[in-house]
Amino acid sequence: MAEAVGHQNSTEHLRKVYGELGMVHGVVMGNRTLETGRHCYPEDLFHYCVGLDSLVLDRGRSIPEDLPDQVEEHLKRPSCCGVKLYPGYNRLWLTDPVYDPIYRLAERYDKPVAVHTGLTAYARAHLKYSHPLALDEAAADHPRTRFVMCHFGNPFLQEAAAVLGKNPNVCADLSGLLEGRVELDRYFEEQAGYAGLLKSWLASTCAWDRILYGTDWPIVNLGEYIGFIQRLAPERHWEAVFFENANRVYGLGL
């Protein structure tokens, strides 16, 4: 997959590309195990969010009794900067009681809960669980827990903007809005309607201090995606979107 977008799936390659593009750090998402020993990343390059995906929760059919304890072991680690939830794939509402102790732990350790919102990668997942309005309920009920609305709820842009605007404890990342290689001038010409809506709804939130750059790598070329986000965010907000917000929200200490 990485090769299809002009990259190599290796730490050495990413370190080189990060240096060339001026990227200083990354947050690894989508981890498929709760074993702490399987989460060892170069500390100068990555933090990670421990992921509760369908392989961990078996689409909501099998919840480990010690799930909160396992998650807490990760949150205790300096290299773990949050939790990642996949409600559409697990077919669990974000208000399901199984998540309550996770939200409390995130609050206690002052680390965010990132949530996959919007479209899913395969048809068997259920969109109703990953709709931005599902996140609104969890954010409203847990006002002292920080949430990151991954993918800005795409394509539910209007609802995503409403959730971001309403809830001060919600941030949004702009990862995964493209897939594959892209020629930006052509893209913004052919997809002018969608791009215009996306840009307008982002601007409508007046929340550039809570909007984060992200990629969903390896589905995009990093250099091209930086250019894509630069066309969506006003230049005066680039430092916040590309660095300051993620550094603050995920507590990276950079």
What feature does the model see in each segment?
Residues 29, 86, 244:
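Conserved residues at the C-terminal ends of beta-strands
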Residues 11-15, 34-38, 68-72, 99, ...:
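Generic structural signal for well-ordered alpha-helices
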Residues 18, 38-40, 75, 139, ...:
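N-terminal cationic-hydrophobic initiation segments that often serve targeting/anchoring roles
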Residues 47, 95-212:
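Catalytic pocket-lining loop regions of alpha/beta-barrel enzymes
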Residues 1-25, 78, 200, 204-212, ...:
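Mid-to-C-terminal alpha-helical segments outside catalytic/metal-binding sites
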Residues 18, 83, 106, 151, ...:
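Conserved, mostly hydrophobic/aromatic
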